[in-house]
Every structure is written in C-alpha cells, then in structure tokens.
Amino acid sequence: MGQQDQQNHQTGSPIKVNLQHDLNWLLQSQPLMAATPEVDNFQPQDAFHQTHISTTHVHTYPAQPAYRLGKQFEDCVSHLFKSSSTHDIIARNIVIQTAARTLGELDIIYQNSRAQIVHLELAIKFYLLNKDGTQLMDFVGPTGHDRLDLKWDRLRQHQLPLSQTSPVINFLQQQRLAKPTCQQLLLTGILFYAYKNWQSTLIESIGLNPNHQRGWWLEHHELAQLKPIKGLERSFIVLPKWHWIGGPRHCIEPQMIDYKELVARTTLDPWPNMVLMYERHQSHQLFIFKNRGLILATKKPPLVS
C-alpha cells in the first residue's frame, strides 16, 4: 500500500469517502471490454434518472488493511440504483450456499425499467500494458497479481453463467428471490500505457472497448519524463487508494506537490502510486487537471528500457 494508505494503517482511522464523486466518475466511464454476443454491458447512464444532483453521500470504511476498493465500488453502484426511478436492486452480494459447499456469489439482482430481472456482475480494474504487449494477457495489475485476460475469462465463463445453473436457480427459489432472465456485466476502470506513447497506443482485435478510459504509467527510473517543460508548470497529487475511482473529483481543495516532491515521495515507496497531473502556462492561472497515471518501482529488468 502507498504512503497515505500506510499512514492510515498506522492511525487506524476510519476512511470516509464521498461516493457521489465516484458516481460522477462512473457516469462518465466506459466498459473496458466491448460487448459480445454472450456479454451484455451494463450502462450506468441508463439507470441514472436523478431529478436533482446530490453533492454528498459519505460512506465510512475500515482502516487499512481491512479497507477494500471493490467494496467501495459496489457501494458506488448501489448508490446509482438508489438514485434511479427506473431500476431497483432486489438483492446484492448473494452467497450461493448449498448443503455441500459454497457455489459462488451473485453481485446484484435488479429489476430494470422493462420489468426484467437481471443478474449484474461488477468489477473495477486498473491494468497496465506491459512493454511491447499486444494481447489481453499483457495487461497486468499494478502489483503484477492480476491479468485482464484471466479476469475477463472468469467473468464470462463462470460468474455470468452462474445464475443460469440449476443449483443457483433452486437456491434463489428457496430464498424467495426472483430468477434472473438475463445477465449483464459492469467491468470498468482504466487501462494504463507506457508514458511515452500513452495517448496513441492502440491495441486492436483483442476485444477492448476502443473508448475505454486510459492513463499513463512509468517506473522510478523514468520519472524525468514528468519534468515541467519551458512555458508549462506542472503539479501533482498522489492519491490514496480510496480516491482511485473518482480521482480528481475527490480533490475539491487539492494539496498539490511539485515535481521534486513527487520524485522524493514516490521513489521512497515500493508500492504503486496513482498520480494526478495538473498543468498551467502562467503562474497567475489555476492549475487544470490533465490526466492520471501510475508510478511503479523499477523492476529488474525494467518494464521499459
């Protein structure tokens, strides 16, 4: 965990998050993968019919290391449904337990505007593309413990079909829960590309949604690429894990650091750091948010030479 997460672990202070900021991000987000004949992508915008915009919806989470980003994302989606006049959650986090064993868990069962009962699976992921990568397997998690291809296969081949199996249908009947008639997936997040060409790198024909949200990544030995250039000032914010979803939306009164402080802070940290970059051309101007990226400890050999 990053420095702010480590400090939270040491203090043991509960983590307070305004989920409205995460929901605002979600409503602007895109699926990581394109829809297929077997996978119907859930569109958060279709469920959002709030007549007034709320600015605050604070949830409290346990301190690190008990805090979980996935739980925060589930609560964000639940907040979306609570704001909807057309979509209603019937049940969430349904553990399928038989006499013999636990078969799995359904994230959400909801009813949509057409009175359909839908099984919805959720996942938010942040993957970076390895050097010279061209396949889904080359998108890996910031700590190297996860891969996009494995997650995609797990969701398609196991999680989504689960609600169509006889044991699960029987379990839902026993619990007096409606049987889903269709399945949807909300797999969103950000894909990060090597900083040098992060905006222009295109990986086609592997099923990615071409409109997915993207960012950059680099390793400690490459941080000089972030130096301000003549006529352009840069400032940065290092995000705690609980601000990874909403990003800049959480930074109402941002406490920015300059390039030197960024280098000092991130190179002392062996864990991945998510960073927001801000720019301005003149000192009397306000800094404008430009993009976000991941800074990683240099691996041997480096991911990028």
Name every feature range the model reports, one short phrase each.
Residues M1-S305:
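Intrinsically disordered, low-complexity Ser/Thr/Pro/Gly-rich regulatory segments
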